[in-house]
Amino acid sequence: MKIVEEKILGYLDSKRDEIIDFLRKLVRIPSVVGEELEAQKFMYRTFRDMDLEVDTWEPDVNELRKHPAFFETTSFRKYGYKNRPNVIGKLRGGGGGSSIFLCGHIDVVSPEPISDWTYPPWSGGIVNGKMYGRGAADQKGGICINDLCVKEHSRFRI
């Protein structure tokens, strides 16, 4: 293993509890399609606490429809975008290098029927080293890693 990889993996291991805590908090916020507002408020507070520039907005449906690639999904037809804001946290660089854009989605598929779950879908419980809960892997886990990358980018000169 390369020295850089060893440093990063060692660092991640040292942050394990913090990473798990953040992901568990996010998993415990139900964010079924159409009901993402509370989870987006959580992300807003998270970005603000990281001293990022934060921007939120609800997409303009009429403007979206003008785009040639617009596709009206079933969830869009059912829920639209009211109370489903996009939340962006921006960290401006100080140099002339390239930018990076980390993104993810906070909505999850309904856990129904709840009776089919071995572990509660909003628990974020850990069993045998694995976290269980709606969104733990898709995509709240990815959001958690994005959060860590932004927090720690300068440590690894990324």
List each model region and its residues.
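Acidic/histidine-rich catalytic neighborhood of metal-dependent amide-processing enzymes
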Residues: 131, 135-158
